[in-house]
Amino acid sequence: MPVITFDYDDLKELGIDIDREKLLDVLPMMGSDIEDFDDESIKVEFFPNRPDLLSVEGVARSLRGFLGIEKGMPSYDVHDSGVEVTVDESVLDVRPYLGMAVIEDVQFTDKKLKQVMEFQEDLHWVIGRDRRKVAIGIHDLDRVEPPFLYSGVEPEGVTFTPLDSVCEMTPHEILEEHPKGVSYAHLLRDHDRYPLITDKNGDVLSMPPIINGELTKLTVNTRRILVDVTGTDDRAVRQTLNIICTSFAEAGGRIGSVRVKRPDGELHLPDLTPREMRVSVSEASRITGLELSADEVMDLLMKARMDARRTSDDEVVAVIPAYRVDILHEVDLVENIAVQHCIGRIEPELPDIATIAEEDTWSRADASIREVMVGLGFQEVMSLMLTSEESHYRRMRLEEDERVEVAQPISQDRTMIRKSLLNGLLEFFEDNKHEDLPQKIFEVGDVVYINPESETRSRVVTKLACAVTHSSAGFTEIKSLAAAVVENLGYEFRIEPLEHPSFIEGRCAAIESEGKSSAIGGFFGEVHPEVVTNFNLEYPVIALEIEFK
């Protein structure tokens, strides 16, 4: 999770005069962990659902509410900067969305510049999915001349000096030779045009999402900055821009809007229009265990730096500031109410319910499945439900499709919820290549599919998967294992030929069966040699996956 470091003096400059001991007590109550501290500074880890707390300005803003210094939604004036930027159609297939804003009257020190860079990189991880979804550029506005153009250029179409370099390079050379270009080349390599932001004179500000130009590098003398946010998700782009702008405004900066001319219309950004959400007083009381009135709910929401108004004795409308991108549901408001009341003051209680315990039906079935697999000589493994598109799709030779993505991943290896167990088993083989053969492993676990009709827009399915690797693993062996598994579970089954990208053509089969109370379906076969190679394995692999419907 993201960790930020700031001095106690930083908080004092932002209106928080608090002794160290009290600060160490208060911060965990706001949803953070204290990583380290000394006489001058503190290192704090915040949960990734609160990207607005990834800067010391955001922390101070929240602290002022928690401590009762200020209540209600902060007000930010946004004036028209007169700056325009045009989004050219040539960039729509690469990185179509752009947000831009001007911040004036900024004051930088060497320490502040470092904090800004750390803030930027934390947002790249938490919202930007390591720049794939969102990338940020911050520039010295006085070094360039508007209006600006966001367009796609050919790999050898222009030269400019990238940040912290002395030589001009083409976009292609940056991807091949510059350290940042090499690290993020995969984001652009499949495209024949690369995004570029240029000014009126053709000078290059940035090559999103790779690197800024040296021309607009921030210094302690910078007084006006231009913030650009590009990405593949318009909502995430606007949210990121709002968080950055309001953070600078907390430090005394003045926000100027930019006219963004897109092919589908014009808009002025940032848009700091708040949104409203209703919360039930009785529901908040039930969830928290507190006896709350509408007035108390309003007061607690205002401590959370929102505005609130009562519409009835049992309903309050919360007015949510644009930088609070974590508020998605009524229960999020209830969480904020509990935090502002101080979670540590809420007494835990045992539920006043008398029941006779009984083992869940699926738990009994789950135990039977494991017993069958162990009896067949398999060893159980447990992998994480979170995986990545690289492992789940590309290494398995699968086309990407609808999936549940992690909105604010803390690692590029954990960006989605799995839809299959097989790649996890192959990763286990990859990590245990040094062990003796044969290796026979299985896993029983949940996967998640998109389901627009459900309340959560998702559907949880339990699957069984097993895999075997040794020098002579083949279709006959996995067919026998599939039959043994299904028969021991009490099903009659039928087998039909199946083509599956992860398996060798002609050596994969679908399995369908009907039981007394449920149905199962799945497939098995010899894993494709390309998949075996993708996981750096040296011997054939056979695998089975069954879904319990």
UniProtKB/Swiss-Prot annotation:
Protein's cellular compartments: Cytoplasm
Positions bound to Mg(2+) = D326, D332, E335, N336
Kindly state one GO CC term assigned in the UniProt record: phenylalanine-tRNA ligase complex
Against Pfam families, the record matches this protein to: B3_4, B5, tRNA_synthFbeta
Q: Does the keyword Metal-binding apply?
A: yes
Q: Which CDD domains match?
A: PheRS_beta_core
The entry lists its GO molecular-function terms as: ATP binding; magnesium ion binding; phenylalanine-tRNA ligase activity; RNA binding
Fetch the SUPFAM superfamilies from UniProt. Answer: Class II aaRS and biotin synthetases, Putative DNA-binding domain
Residues forming the B5 domain are: 272-348
Q: What is its main location?
A: cytoplasm
Question: Catalytic activity annotated for this protein?
Answer: tRNA(Phe) + L-phenylalanine + ATP = L-phenylalanyl-tRNA(Phe) + AMP + diphosphate + H(+)
Task: Name one process (GO BP) from the record.
Answer: phenylalanyl-tRNA aminoacylation
Disulfide bond positions: none
**What Enzyme Commission number(s) appear in the record?**
6.1.1.20
Please name the InterPro entries in this protein's record.
aa-tRNA-synth_II/BPL/LPL, B3/B4_tRNA-bd, DNA-bd_dom_put_sf, Phe-tRNA-ligase_IIc_bsu, Phe-tRNA-synth_IIc_bsu_arc_euk, Phe-tRNA_synthase-like_B3/B4, Phe_tRNA_ligase_beta2_arc, PheRS_beta_core
Subunit annotation = Tetramer of two alpha and two beta subunits.
Name assigned to this protein? Phenylalanine--tRNA ligase beta subunit
The organism's taxonomic lineage, starting at the top:
Archaea, Methanobacteriati, Methanobacteriota, Methanomada group, Methanobacteria
